[in-house]
């Protein structure tokens, strides 16, 4: 199958401007294409990964990617389907975030090898060189207000109010396409389905200003089987930066994907062939309780984003915590694996008697309950059962001289830090 057919088979094509013409272009020669990433945070997240990996698939098929960091559009803010105006960031912040996003993109696209090696561009480079008057005369005149207001991405905001700044965003994104076409012969833009309105503004500008045809292809916004927006864990984004979301947290996210999503996500987020995925699906459906699809998904994506060593560490943390083998893990590994459990900073004046500490740290609700928990064998200190009511914590109980892990019952953990 050709690359477009593969993208479709993987569920990666949501909408195109002219499918027949796009398929013809992709099968007859090398296509230069771009995907834009606005620096709205200091890291990309899993939601961005769909477009990034789609871009990589096209590169592997011989086409040339341009990764556009929106240093200028990031200063404005995209209003698409947003309920309220974005908070404007400072130029210094956007510049810093732009650099970090550039570094992350370098992990996924090949910027070094072959005639189709990826190139990084920043739209601040051209927007900083064009005057407001020139922009209105040379670009703005090609867009009617009626056309701009008809976009689904802004209709909702028209009712509640939208600033001229954000209203002009689609014109800026449209100009990106024009600029990249003029300088690099870029003829295809790839983005999320929520970007359709902004992206087709680019094909409109190309047609009117340069009498050229541009293509747009959107990838779907991923939701889980319940319709919940993908890439969030308990309201928090799953970031690609290991400092913001540890490899262990990312591993757990994939491991806990619902059965009805697992195979679909293997097609979208991994480079396993469709035949390999079909074989995994057959095994998975025969014994879903073994969670083969989720385990494969976790392995492939964590390795892709963070590397083999990070995957092996995440796997080891998972296995050791499941076995209760706390002492087999370093303090750094425990901080990853127990990042979401209550943490108590031990104070100099705190009593180190275990009964007192269980209450002080909020592990047991009262001294009476703490004593009962100890006597009943429900308390574990660094993975080992403790029943001595007179036991006092010492430096010997500190893993790497940094922390102590206490468990009450099977699942209630607390971390003491010093």
UniProtKB/Swiss-Prot annotation:
EC number: 6.1.1.1
UniProt KW keywords: Aminoacyl-tRNA synthetase, ATP-binding, Cytoplasm, Ligase, Nucleotide-binding, Protein biosynthesis, RNA-binding
Domain S4 RNA-binding residues, every copy: 352-418
Enzyme class: ligase
GO biological process terms on file: tyrosyl-tRNA aminoacylation
GO CC annotations, alphabetized: cytosol
Lineage: superkingdom: Bacteria
Short motif ('HIGH' region): ranges: 39-48
Motif 'KMSKS' region boundaries: 229-233
Primary location class: cytoplasm
GO molecular function, one term: ATP binding
Catalyzed reactions per annotation: tRNA(Tyr) + L-tyrosine + ATP = L-tyrosyl-tRNA(Tyr) + AMP + diphosphate + H(+)
Residues that hold ATP according to the record: 232
Annotated positions binding L-tyrosine: 34, 169, 173
Similarity section: Belongs to the class-I aminoacyl-tRNA synthetase family. TyrS type 1 subfamily.
Quaternary data: Homodimer.
Job description of the protein: Catalyzes the attachment of tyrosine to tRNA(Tyr) in a two-step reaction: tyrosine is first activated by ATP to form Tyr-AMP and then transferred to the acceptor end of tRNA(Tyr).
Protein name per Swiss-Prot or TrEMBL: Tyrosine--tRNA ligase
Gene that this polypeptide is encoded by: tyrS
């Amino acid at each position: 199958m050709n690359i477009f057919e593969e993208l479709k088979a993987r569920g990666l094509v949501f909408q195109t401007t002219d499918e027949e013409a796009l398929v013809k272009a992709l099968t007859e020669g090398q296509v230069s294409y771009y995907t834009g990433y606005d620096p709205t945070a200091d890291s990309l997240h899993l939601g961005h990964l769909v477009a990034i990996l789609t871009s990589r698939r096209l590169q592997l098929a011989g086409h040339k990617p341009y990764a556009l960091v929106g240093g200028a559009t990031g200063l404005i803010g995209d209003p698409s389907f947003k309920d309220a105006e974005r908070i404007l960031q400072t130029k210094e912040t956007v510049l810093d975030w732009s650099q970090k996003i550039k570094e992350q993109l370098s992990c996924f696209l090949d910027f070094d090898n072959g005639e189709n090696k990826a190139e990084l561009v920043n739209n601040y480079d051209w927007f900083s060189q064009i005057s407001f008057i020139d922009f209105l005369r040379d670009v703005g005149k090609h867009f009617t207000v009626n056309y701009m207001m008809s976009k689904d991405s802004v209709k909702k905001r028209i009712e509640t109010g939208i600033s001229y700044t954000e209203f002009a965003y689609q014109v800026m994104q449209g100009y990106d396409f024009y600029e990249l076409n003029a300088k690099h012969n870029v003829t295809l833009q790839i983005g999320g389905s929520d970007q359709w309105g902004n992206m087709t503004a680019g094909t409109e500008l190309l047609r009117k200003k340069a009498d050229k045809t541009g293509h747009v292809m959107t990838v779907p916004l991923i939701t889980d089987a319940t319709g919940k927006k993908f890439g969030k864990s308990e309201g928090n984004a799953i970031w690609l930066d290991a400092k913001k979301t540890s490899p262990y947290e990312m591993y757990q996210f994939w491991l806990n994907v619902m059965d009805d999503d697992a195979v679909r996500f293997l097609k979208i987020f991994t480079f396993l062939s469709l035949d390999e995925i079909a074989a995994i699906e057959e095994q998975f459906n025969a014994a879903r309780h073994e969670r083969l699809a989720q385990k494969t998904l976790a392995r492939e994506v964590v390795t892709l984003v963070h590397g083999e060593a990070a995957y092996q560490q995440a796997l080891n943390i998972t296995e050791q915590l499941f076995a209760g083998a706390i002492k087999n893990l370093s303090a750094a590994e425990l901080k990853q694996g127990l990042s979401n459990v209550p943490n108590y900073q031990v104070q100099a004046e705190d009593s180190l008697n275990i009964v007192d500490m269980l209450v002080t740290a909020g592990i047991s609700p009262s001294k009476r309950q703490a004593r009962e928990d100890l006597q009943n064998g429900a308390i574990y200190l660094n993975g080992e059962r403790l029943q001595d009511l007179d036991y006092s914590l010492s430096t010997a109980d500190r893993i790497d001289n940094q922390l102590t892990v206490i468990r009450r019952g099977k699942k209630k953990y607390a971390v003491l830090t010093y």
